């Protein structure tokens, strides 16, 4: 994503997987963290001149300052940060959450706020949105008799 993808108070995104074009309002707020999309984007601006929202801030082996950060690099950095956080995971946890799990978490968070997550996530079917909204066994399921 680039800063040039922002106009008329929307972040314009063309999804890689489906090609769906989304215009997400900058005033979209995630109540769980108390930030709007505009707040997050403002944090992407720093002392490094770059057309990219997510960019390298200094020159190193993976790229020069201002260059685009590839998705695989973001996932790797997420894994490193997750591992350094020293979180105690349940003993029955068979797989630690990957970077992509944030998409499911945001789906559940925005749905609780009454936001149309099917459109927000760029899904064509409600079934796909339901899959992303799965609570991963966190909530008790009541048996109805």
PLM features: what roles do these ranges have?
Residues 15-19, 121-145:
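Catalytic-site neighborhood detector that most strongly recognizes the C-terminal catalytic loop/helix
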């Amino acid at each position: 994503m680039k800063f040039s993808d922002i106009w008329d108070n929307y972040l314009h995104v063309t999804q890689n997987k489906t090609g769906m074009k989304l215009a997400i309002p900058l005033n979209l707020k995630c109540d769980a963290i108390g930030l709007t999309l505009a707040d997050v984007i403002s944090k992407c601006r720093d002392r490094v001149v770059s057309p990219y929202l997510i960019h390298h801030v200094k020159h190193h082996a993976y790229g020069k300052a201002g260059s685009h950060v590839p998705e695989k690099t973001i996932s790797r950095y997420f894994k490193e940060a997750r591992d350094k956080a020293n979180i105690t995971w349940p003993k029955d946890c068979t797989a630690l959450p990957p970077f992509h799990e944030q998409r499911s978490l945001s789906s559940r968070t925005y749905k609780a706020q009454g936001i149309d997550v099917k459109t927000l996530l760029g899904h064509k079917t409600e079934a796909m949105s339901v899959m992303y909204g799965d609570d991963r066994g966190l909530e008790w399921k009541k048996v109805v008799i």
